[in-house]
Amino acid sequence: GWTRKLSFLAEPLFRFGNLGSRCSAAFTTAFFSGVAANAILYDHYKEGRIEKRHLFLTNVVNQLPAFFLHLPTTFFIVIPLTRWAGALYFLLTFLAVLLRTAIVLLYGHLKARPPVEGGPEDFPPQETAAGRMRMSEVAAAVRRRLPSRVAGIAVWVVPVYIAVHLLNAMGLFAALRDAMAGMAVGALVPVESLSVVILSFAAEFTSGFAAAGALMDAGVLTVKQTVLALLMGNVLAFPVRALRHQLPRYVGIFTPKLGTQLLLAGQGLRLASLVLVGAAYALVG
């Protein structure tokens, strides 16, 4: 039921963006599993049903369901720690997601060619026995393909984690973190928020929000300064989070080259949208 309702809402947007029903189906799947959504996209791309441009654009649009997928695990931890500042942070990050989604769909509308459709996999499931059968076939296909994708991810997780651990032991991330945090804090927010940015940089955002709440309660930071510091921490956390968590998944599902390209393109747009939204908030907030 939820899948059909989400598909009904997504179809007009994906028609506008010239991305087609296959990419729309992957978008719907992303509300439940990002790995499964990427596996579906890559299968369509390998079999020539969608072009590379459709793959890249849909990968960015799928950041919208990813936002909601992870929201329940963070919202009820963050809000008690930071209260209004945390709520503003979530609002701004959501606006950033909407901004890049709108930009990508508009770009697709202007530049992308609609994929050729008409195969049996393109017909939406109906409220009939045949429709329910097609849904079960889709679920069976996901169950068949997902284990191989997960195995591919596992192959890359171990070496990447070892490499990250070695680089961390050598002090590379600490030096990079301190340098970037120092530059950003000195230019945009008070020095007192340095600890918030550094803790957020470590990709464990609960610590950053806890520090932010403590600084606000002590009167060191205002709500606005705390929100800006948390947004900066989100941006500065990209290198560590990408290496630790995202790169193994991307190169495991896609090829190493394609997975890296998708990761950099998607995260580049994410960071740009966060910077734009944060700058607007700094000016008018």
Model segments located where?
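Transmembrane helical segments that form the transport core of multi-pass membrane transport proteins
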Residues: G1-F14, R143-V220
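Alpha-helical membrane-protein architecture signal
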Residues: S24, R53, L57, M135-R143
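Juxtamembrane and boundary regions of transmembrane helices in multi-pass small-molecule transporters
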Residues: K46-E47, P80-A129, N234-G285
